């Protein structure tokens, strides 16, 4: 999931801060998701999926 989230963010040309603002989390939390330090809860995964225009399954199961 971490690599997918980072790749999606870079592809969308967004900063960790921009993603964090959208999902209601800090820049550090987004960084933690991107480097395997933590995983988003289901509600946050849904927001990330919406932000990156992908399915929640893609995020949760790292497809």
What residue spans do the PLM features occupy?
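Short basic helix-loop element that most often maps to the first helix and adjoining turn
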Residues: 3-22
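Conserved hydrophobic/aromatic packing and binding residues within compact polymer-binding modules
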Residues: 5, 19-20, 30-33, 59
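Conserved short acidic donor-positioning loop in nucleotide-sugar-dependent glycosyltransferases
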Residues: 62
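Helix-turn-helix DNA-binding elements, focusing on the entry/boundary residues of the two helices
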Residues: 5, 16, 27, 42-45
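Generic anion/oxyanion-binding catalytic loop in active/binding sites
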Residues: 8-9, 20, 34-37, 48
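DNA major-groove recognition helix of helix-turn-helix/homeodomain DNA-binding modules
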Residues: 24, 43-58
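Recognition helix of helix-turn-helix/homeodomain-like DNA-binding domains
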Residues: 24-39
């Amino acid at each position: 999931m971490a690599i997918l989230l980072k790749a999606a963010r870079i592809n969308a040309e967004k900063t960790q801060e921009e993603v964090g603002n959208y999902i209601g989390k800090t820049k550090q939390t987004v960084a933690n998701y991107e480097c395997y330090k933590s995983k988003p809860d289901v509600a946050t995964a849904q927001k990330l999926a919406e932000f990156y225009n992908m399915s929640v399954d893609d995020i949760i199961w790292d497809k």
